Amino acid sequence: MNKIFSSHVMPFRALIDACWKEKYTAARFTRDLIAGITVGIIAIPLAMALAIGSGVAPQYGLYTAAVAGIVIALTGGSRFSVSGPTAAFVVILYPVSQQFGLAGLLVATLLSGIFLILMGLARFGRLIEYIPVSVTLGFTSGIGITIGTMQIKDFLGLQMAHVPEHYLQKVGALFMALPTINVGDAAIGIVTLGILVFWPRLGIRLPGHLPALLAGCAVMGIVNLLGGHVATIGSQFHYVLADGSQGNGIPQLLPQLVLPWDLPNSEFTLTWDSIRTLLPAAFSMAMLGAIESLLCAVVLDGMTGTKHKANSELVGQGLGNIIAPFFGGITATAAIARSAANVRAGATSPISAVIHSILVILALLVLAPLLSWLPLSAMAALLLMVAWNMSEAHKVVDLLRHAPKDDIIVMLLCMSLTVLFDMVIAISVGIVLASLLFMRRIARMTRLAPVVVDVPDDVLVLRVIGPLFFAAAEGLFTDLESRLEGKRIVILKWDAVPVLDAGGLDAFQRFVKRLPEGCELRVCNVEFQPLRTMARAGIQPIPGRLAFFPNRRAAMADL
């Protein structure tokens, strides 16, 4: 077990570091309590809104924030992260919930948890850092656009029997449904969104989510007095408990232990075929969860001066996503906005995230009847604000203005693919394209430079600068071959060649074979890695054709 869970992968790392290695005092608990309550106030409406956006009833978002929030806080590797349902998952979870129902979504969440633990055990935590900013910005902006589009129906109260799955068809259907706008829903949505936008400018430390929802409810009261009809959580969502009792809105009880694949009234059947069908979505959830949770941890490190444990965080995220489905929780990861609010509110340890989850549980037990009165247009306004923040429009504009053309192409491609297809295709294509463009950029840096030295006319002395890898070597040796006419000796100085890969080695060997008769290649100042690569390949000096020297002086000794 110790070999599997090393110090870099072991769960509970953040909790141990924050509360065991550092003295946990009453003063620190007070700060965590205040931070936990602050974040809990933000999390309650967001968790419900994100569950609705994911195609399931709002209580499942609360179950996620409660159960996954506690498990990940205690077992993860980032002491300030607050986990729960996040906006990034909406575009993945909604199609799964529509096709397979809640049970299929819970099974996919469980599978994603297994993937996350495997990523942590394989120490993939630091590999996430190699995903280019242009890729992450492209797909997060694309997700923001998609989420924003998905909220227009509820925000305006449009009457739509069916919402198409493809983005362009969805936009067309929304446009055609505009004549069915519900003025009451639209008024509530606009007021709620307006308060969310302008609240931060007031300088009040209380998060704007609660005042915005209260204002939306006040407008709903006016609409009802005027005889209008407004869609609420209670009017749109119904539940059936295990004992057969039914109700509207949100059940006033704790999350119940269930088998994710065996829910009451579910048509989902757990088979190898169903698991195989869910695996791509589960892997997408795991990839997105890993990226978002580790990006969140990096942001928090910058805010607090601490250092997260990337692989421990992946293991903690995996445990949370494995345990949560047994209590009705959907996919969870660290939420950047809630985690940043946690830090700003004075959090000192993962205990603040636990307190935030406890507050969510108390809301389930005490406030469920009141939460059922929340208007759906106000929930949509919350998600529109989340979508705007997630799009990071200011960063997109900055990249368009100042970044190299290659990065702009990658970002726009990732954004478009995320909107038109899905995140997995966007990230896969984006990483491949970014890698190819990066290799082209590096290949252009590999070149031949003249060495100023007094030698006979039939001797050529050049310095190779840059890595000799597959994308650069062929062009470099082709250039060198064009300079060989009338040369008896060619001296190549390799002191600026840090890397020689298999492609570079192959190009080098073919160049040696193509050397004109009577021309000798002398290689000197070879660095360790290229020297080791040639030694492993069995490259040997060839009298009169190929020779190796420790330095340029030795290579020129007999000229």
Swiss-Prot record:
NCBIfam families: PRK11660.1, sulP. This is C4-dicarboxylic acid transporter DauA. It is a multi-pass membrane protein. Responsible for the aerobic transport of succinate from the periplasm to the cytoplasm at acidic pH. Can transport other C4-dicarboxylic acids such as aspartate and fumarate. May also play a role in the regulation of C4-dicarboxylic acid metabolism at pH 7, via regulation of expression and/or activity of DctA. May act as a co-sensor of DcuS. Keywords: Cell inner membrane, Cell membrane, Membrane, Transmembrane, Transmembrane helix, Transport. Residues 1-32, 76-101, 148-177, 234-278, 335-350, 394-418 are periplasmic. The gene is dauA. Its main location: membrane. Coiled coil: none annotated. It is found in: Cell inner membrane. It comes from the Bacteria.
